[in-house]
């Protein structure tokens, strides 16, 4: 497996391909507040209905996200109580044949009331401190889905950034090849079992509804296989601390042909560039000359070696 940057993927017009995948509406059981019955429905189970297009990430769930500025509704559907963004009720509450589902509107409340509440782990395994809570995030909208977003920090950029901000556990359930390393689908490639996961969880009552969608999905521009987002330990160059120096160097000392690139595309790239990932773990790449060690006092040291001669000298031979 090979890590790829967004730029590498988007440079190839054919990297994004239209495919059909199962999306699922998942039932996360809301816990009552400590010391009192559920404030939304007396002594009845209440489920937060979250939508995801990646059923294979559900085993790594550690949080849910809502928008505190949206209004949410609790409804009763076939004897079950669901919480969904009010503006999305008509879109969500249809069956798999796209027919409206009858429901009773029980309550409406601001999203702010959900923030900080806890829910039961989806597949039974508690992922540790600060896991399985509801957080407010602006990226949650009423454009699509249910107004409630399943968060698996190891497998999505927004998810990971949210986890870093709130100190939410980042749980890996897949290796770098996309094969499960734990749980019921141990040893299976995610693309081989994605549909099976959706169907199995629906049979168990964890998934309320499966909706197949056609969407544009990134593929490797070399081999044509599907790509996955996966958090991976990496070395980064701190671009933010060097940005002004880089802009000055480009302006004062570099001549560009054609000239318009200098203060155009390249300068704009520097102005907007995020930290640069230096380590890609590619089997054909050169090793990074970074050495780490611990001295006799237990203090860690990092040394960047600039040449073979320097490395030879440091080796003490």
Per-range role (PLM):
Residues 1-59, 113-118, 127-130, 139, ...:
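Residue patterns forming the tRNA-binding/recognition surfaces of aminoacyl-tRNA synthetases
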Residues 37-53, 81-91, 107, 300-310:
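Short amphipathic beta-strand/extended segments with alternating polar/hydrophobic composition
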Residues 28-30, 52, 68, 76-79:
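Short, structured patches in soluble enzyme cores that scaffold and shape functional sites
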Residues 65-67, 293:
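Short beta-strand-to-turn element immediately C-terminal to the catalytic PLP-Schiff-base lysine
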């Amino acid at each position: 497996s090979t890590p790829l940057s967004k730029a590498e993927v988007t440079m190839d017009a054919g990297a994004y391909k239209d495919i059909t995948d199962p999306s699922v509406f998942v039932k996360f059981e809301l816990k009552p507040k400590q010391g009192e019955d559920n404030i939304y429905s007396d002594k009845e189970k209440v489920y937060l209905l979250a939508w995801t297009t990646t059923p294979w990430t559900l085993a790594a769930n550690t949080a849910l996200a809502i928008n505190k500025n949206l209004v949410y509704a609790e409804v009763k559907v076939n004897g079950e109580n669901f919480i969904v963004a009010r503006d999305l009720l008509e879109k969500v509450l249809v069956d798999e044949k796209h027919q409206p589902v009858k429901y009773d509107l029980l309550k409406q409340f601001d999203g702010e009331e959900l923030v900080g509440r806890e829910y039961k782990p989806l597949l039974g395994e508690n992922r540790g401190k600060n896991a399985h809570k509801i957080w407010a995030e602006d990226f949650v909208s009423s454009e699509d889905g249910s107004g409630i977003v399943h968060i698996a920090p190891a497998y999505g950029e927004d998810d990971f950034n949210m986890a870093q901000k709130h100190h939410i556990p980042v749980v890996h359930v897949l290796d770098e090849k996309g094969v499960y390393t734990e749980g019921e689908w141990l040893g299976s490639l995610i693309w081989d079992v994605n549909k099976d996961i959706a169907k199995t969880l629906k049979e168990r009552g964890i998934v309320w509804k499966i909706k197949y969608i056609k969407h544009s999905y990134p593929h490797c521009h070399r081999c044509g296989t599907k790509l996955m987002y996966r958090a991976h330990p990496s070395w980064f160059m701190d671009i933010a601390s060097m940005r002004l120096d880089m802009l000055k160097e480009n302006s004062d000392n570099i001549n560009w042909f054609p000239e318009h690139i200098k203060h155009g595309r390249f300068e704009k790239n520097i102005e907007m560039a995020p930290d640069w990932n230096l380590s890609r773990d590619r089997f054909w790449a050169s090793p990074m000359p970074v050495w780490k060690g611990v001295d006799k006092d237990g203090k860690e040291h990092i040394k960047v070696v600039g040449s073979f001669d320097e490395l030879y000298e440091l080796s003490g031979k």
